[in-house]
Amino acid sequence: MPQKLHIDVETYSSIDITKSGAYKYCESIDFEILILCYAFDKGPIKTIDLLQGETIPQSFLDALIDPEIEKHAHNANFERNCFRAIGYNVPIKQWFCSAIKSGYCGLPLGLGAVSEALNLQDEGKLATGRALIRFFSCPVKPTKKNEQRERNFPIHDLEKWEEYKRYCQNDVKAERKIGEILKNYDIPKFERENYILDQEINDRGILIDLDFADNALALDEVNSEIVGQEMKQITKLENPNSPKQLKDWLGNQMQTEVKSLAKDEIPKLIEEAGPGVVSDVLNLRLRASKTSIKKYVAMQKCVCYDGRAHGLFQFYGASRTGRWAGRLIQLQNLPQNHLAELDKVRSVFKDGKYEEVSALYPDVSSTLSQLIRTAFIAEPEHTFAVADFSAIEARVIAWLADETWRMDVFNSHGKIYEASASQMFGIPIEKIDKSTEEGSAIRSKGKVA
């Protein structure tokens, strides 16, 4: 009996996987597997051309659901979702991902990048794939030249189609070769369990209050228009949102070259300009450039039929450290909120019109940014519990380094950031008060340390 089943698929869906993720991509009504390539152990790679009428062999399906046979794929989450979409919900524990194995070994996650790093050459991922995926696996824009069709099929370029099948075959070859090269570097049981947990978390997803997200974006659209009109009225620019036009205007007003309108540069420009029309425009620019608002757009794009966003974490996504990385909405990078009456504010922004909202909370974009966390909700009759380990990195590093004085801090008052800053700058710890501007600035330096 074979021990391993190596799999790769090429698929079609009208959903943009880069913006919506694999879960929503696979649940699209037009999702289908176009090509299936697979191999048992070191056996020959078999290619099934599903789009041209071939069917998946029963021997493959039997192996797919056999708990004794390991399923191997590069980025196995995708293949697992693909087969679940066509009725084969293979348990996570049966899947093994060569991308995760690569990440564990300090290599890139992408199949092409790993192929290059390991010098797989002819056995590596083919460079032709990106263009072929765009041609066969994505919708195309109807034109007179393509006879107004919205999708390409093999009949539209048989040579490319054969090349696409070879590309899929090579992905199986590359995945299998990576496994052979890294066979002596077993993922520890603890990390394997973490991977399975990661997949369970991604499968479960998180419930999104879409009504709230939709209204938030509607409010932001009105706010952006109003702020833009205010900037236009003051500056007389044709397009005050254009960085070049605005930099030129600011340069003329301030009699100096303005090189950047980056978010962290604007407060410096405001301080340099002082009170007046320039500061007014720069403050409007800050209000109009809250990039975090785009997270509401990401919610809309990736939420699935069950009202949840799935696939928000990438196991071993950070190079070198192997930490989890965020995907799609980027849950690990959410704006803080400092709103005193959070529930009340949220209620107003969920149901209110712009006139009502802006009258109560004039800085609409800032408030919307602070409300992003509240778009994630519990399902009915459940509680959404939010927990965080206090200064967890500082605690673990102190313990690993056997740094006694830091562990003593945690065993007493626990103010590690203040204690670090005290040692750095020779300031008594009791004088570092985070409620004051100076104390907060000093404490933040201790936090970095």
Identify the meaning behind each predicted range:
Residues 9-15, 24-26, 75:
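Ser/Thr-glycine-rich phosphate-binding loops at phosphate-binding pockets of nucleotides
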Residues 1-11, 15-17, 35, 117, ...:
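Conserved "right-hand" nucleotidyltransferase catalytic core of DNA-directed polymerases
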Residues 104, 387, 408-412:
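Conserved, non-catalytic sequence blocks in retroelement Pol enzymes and Pol-derived host proteins
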Residues 429-449:
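Structured DNA-binding interfaces in DNA transaction proteins
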Residues 13, 77-88, 103-105, 247-254, ...:
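Short active-site loop/helix that positions an aromatic residue
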Residues 31-33, 38, 42-183, 340-341, ...:
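Active-site-proximal helix-loop-helix substrate-binding element of RNase H-like nuclease domains
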Residues 90-92, 255-261, 343, 401-412:
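Cytochrome P450 catalytic domain signature, combining two hallmark sequence patches
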Residues 23, 30-32, 393-427:
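Metal-dependent catalytic core segments for phosphate chemistry
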